[in-house]
Design a protein with these regions (language model features):
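An accessory alpha-helical subdomain
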Residues: 162, 166-242
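Catalytic cores of RNA-modifying enzymes
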Residues: 1-184, 188, 240
């Protein structure tokens, strides 16, 4: 990112203040990190590339508010933070969101690939509607803000980008019997998004819940929404399905 004017807008969307500890994932050369350090109490600058980590430490040595952390954010222990303002590598976007959905935070502001961001709020039944849509709906309020011009990046990407904000839903919009199992269930059943529920759910019953083929067949015939196609179910319907399996 070579256009620093976008940093102010990102921090505005995050309502960043002097009490915040902010996570910057994929801190790179530290341009955004330095800007964040002027706005909040502390910044956790996480970078997986050891060469960039050395650059970060050289560039940010004069900022005691910044803690440079080397490693994959998905695999290492991270100190407590309450906000995220970041331009993460696009290839980790879905895994990063799943990781964040299991953390406590007040606000997350990210620059994401626009095509990916559209999946977060896709209408039920649409081409972009999928497991990520359902999990985002369950965990967070998601808002799309402004497009980010390709000229703001160096090198310029081939894809369009957009600023997105996520804020946790409290309480959750519906109840599920097991949050971790819900994630696995939705990911699993959407591999058969065009099939009817009674057929799409059988691999989950056999391979995850360890039901016999006979038990899976019997369960599939009695489930709610069994004759609906997976892609036509609303997020709440997936919660009802899992709860029915757990009852």
């Amino acid at each position: 990112m070579i256009e620093s004017s976008i940093f102010q807008r990102m921090t505005d969307y995050a309502s960043l203040n002097r009490d915040d500890v902010t996570l910057d994932v994929g801190a790179g050369l530290g341009f955004l990190t330095r800007f964040l350090a002027e706005m909040c109490r502390g910044v956790l600058a996480v970078e997986a590339d050891d060469r960039l980590v050395e650059v970060l430490r050289e560039q940010l040595w004069d900022l005691p508010k910044v803690e440079v952390i080397e490693g994959n954010v998905l695999k290492i222990q991270i100190p407590v933070f309450n906000k995220v303002v970041s331009i993460p590598p696009y290839q980790v976007s879905s895994r990063l969101l799943l990781w964040l959905f299991n953390k406590s935070f007040n606000s997350v502001v990210l620059i994401l690939q626009k095509e990916f961001a559209n999946r977060l709020t896709a209408p039920v039944g649409s081409e972009n509607y999928g497991w990520l849509t359902v999990l985002t709906y369950y965990h967070a309020e998601c808002e799309h803000f402004e497009d980010v011009p390709k000229s703001f990046f160096y090198p310029q990407p081939d894809v369009d980008s957009i600023i997105v904000r996520l804020e946790p839903k409290k309480p959750a919009p519906f109840t599920v019997s097991n949050r971790m199992l819900f994630t696995k269930f939705v990911q699993n059943i959407f591999t058969e998004r065009n099939r009817k529920v009674r057929n799409a759910i059988r691999p989950f019953l056999r391979n995850v819940l360890m039901r016999t083929a006979e038990e899976a067949e019997k369960t599939a015939r009695t489930l709610p929404f069994r004759d609906e196609r997976v892609r036509h179910l609303a997020p709440e319907d997936f919660g009802a399905l899992l709860n029915a399996l757990s009852s």
